[in-house]
Curated annotation (Swiss-Prot):
GO biological process, one term: asparaginyl-tRNA aminoacylation
Enzyme class: ligase
GO molecular function, one term: ATP binding
Intracellular or extracellular location(s): Cytoplasm
Subunit structure: Homodimer.
Keyword Ligase annotated: yes
Catalytic activity, as annotated: tRNA(Asn) + L-asparagine + ATP = L-asparaginyl-tRNA(Asn) + AMP + diphosphate + H(+)
Gene Ontology CC: cytoplasm
Name listed for the protein in its UniProt record: Asparagine--tRNA ligase
Record's keyword annotation contains Iron-sulfur: no
Family: Belongs to the class-II aminoacyl-tRNA synthetase family.
EC number: 6.1.1.22
PANTHER family in alphabetical order: ASPARAGINE--TRNA LIGASE, MITOCHONDRIAL-RELATED, ASPARTYL/LYSYL-TRNA SYNTHETASE
């Protein structure tokens, strides 16, 4: 008898198989007991008939509790009405562990109740579907960059300096010295790009922002890319290619999950390059034309981003922000030094910024000047300045927030569902 994953049952019609998993749900009509079993790859209905199975097996099936772990043996047969189109005529059942009364029933529960039991909430079909799409996005990112000759170069999580100032950093004690949890691997990406040409890193990022919104996490994952001899336009094109590739990949490989999430995939099929673009200055004019009192030099908030992105209905690049509201390393536009060669990619449907990036300053003296303007200590960035002393070249990069991308693709209302164990302003457990 072969051990089979539920997702592969269609290949075993008429054969006897062994399924190992957990009881998701059950129902009984008196003479027949239906066991809905999950194994992480799908759901299958096990049918236990009292007359055929015998009194002992039927009684065991009737007494098993929700989320008990089990091993189920039986013959696979087609049944269009059953989950997945197949069911198992059960001939054997073994309880691995009889679960205690399960706290999460199939009825509706409040968000706080579920968040406190996130370690169990992820077992539900909806949450599992989201995590499967997340896995597909992570695999897709790696495939995309590897196919374009980018090298994976891991960046440190503990850093001695801040990438964009210390205001939103988690400070830790590093053997008596101040250190910080990384808010970006970008500075290190710039160093490895000078060695390897094209690089990317994939890891957790930490922001101590006092933000309690549906878009914000204290800990989230970013894929960050950096490439030597890449200018602003090269960078924009790479971002367009990446996002459209990932959307297309999920549409192709996660149809079942998107259907379970009831995602309107029609809103994703048109995500193809080139994406619309709007300069920061034009965006300010657009907002004012809609009756919003917005001054040039201010940074966009969530309502502004939503208004802009909904105007296009597609991901849109907002580019050439004022130099004073962007990071110290952003390269000023040679044609207008008041703005930088940077861009944010806004997702439609109110999901906000999913990518931030731009061309970096490659001139030593200008970078020093920018450090002073941002009140950052030059001595802490000597290693970073070295990159402009020894073979400096034009280079560009960006960071993509995995959870925001996932939330948009899945149509998730709150970003807490886009990561297995969210860390939010007032929640650190489980």
């Amino acid at each position: 008898m072969e051990k089979v994953l539920i997702k592969h049952l269609g290949n075993y019609a008429g054969q006897e198989v062994l399924i190992k998993g957990w009881l998701y749900n059950k129902r009984s009509s008196g003479k027949i007991c239906f066991l809905i079993v999950r194994d992480g790859t799908g759901l299958v209905q096990g049918v236990v008939e009292k007359k055929a199975a015998g009194e002992d097996l039927f009684s065991l099936a009737g007494n098993i509790t929700q989320e008990s772990s089990l091993m189920l043996r039986g013959t696979v047969r087609e049944e269009p009405r059953a989950p997945g189109g197949f069911e198992i005529q059960v001939t054997g059942l073994e309880i691995v562990h009889m679960a205690e009364p399960y706290p999460i029933s199939l009825k509706e529960h409040g968000v706080d109740f579920l968040a406190e039991r996130r370690h169990l909430w992820i077992r539900t079909p909806r949450q599992s579907a989201i995590l499967r799409i997340r896995s597909e996005l992570e695999k897709g990112c790696r495939d995309f960059f590897e196919e374009r000759d980018f090298v994976l170069a891991d960046a440190p999580i503990i850093t001695p300096t801040a990438c964009e100032g210390t205001t939103n950093l988690f400070e830790i004690d590093y053997h008596g010295e101040k250190a910080y949890l990384s808010q970006s691997g970008q500075l290190y990406n710039e160093a490895t790009a000078m060695a390897l040409g094209r690089v990317y890193c994939f890891g957790p990022t930490f922001r101590a922002e006092k933000s309690k919104t549906r878009r914000h996490l204290m800990e989230f994952w970013m894929v960050e890319a950096e490439a030597a001899f890449f200018d602003f336009e090269d960078n924009i094109r790479l971002q367009e290619e990446l996002v459209s590739y990932l959307v297309r990949r999920v549409l192709e490989n996660n149809k079942k999950e998107l259907e379970l999430l009831r995602r309107d995939t029609g809103r994703l099929t048109g995500v193809t390059p080139p994406f619309p673009r709007m300069s920061y200055t034009d965006a300010v004019d657009f907002l004012n034309s809609k009756g919003v009192d917005f001054k040039w030099g201010d940074d966009f908030g969530a309502p502004h981003e939503t208004m802009i992105s909904e105007h296009f209905g597609l991901p849109v690049f907002i580019h050439r922000f004022p130099v004073d509201i962007k990071a110290f390393y952003m390269k000023p536009d040679p044609e207008n030094p008041d703005v930088v060669l940077g861009a944010d990619l806004l997702a439609p449907e109110g999901y906000g910024e999913i990518i931030g990036g731009g061309q970096r300053i490659d001139e030593l003296e200008l970078l020093k000047k920018r450090l002073v303007q941002h009140k950052l200590p030059e001595e802490a960035f000597e290693w970073y300045l070295d990159l402009r002393r020894y073979g400096s070249v034009p280079h560009s990069g960006f960071g993509l927030g995995l959870e925001r991308l996932l939330a948009w693709i899945c149509g998730i209302e709150h970003i807490r569902e886009a990561i297995p164990f969210p860390r939010m302003l007032y929640r650190m457990c489980p």
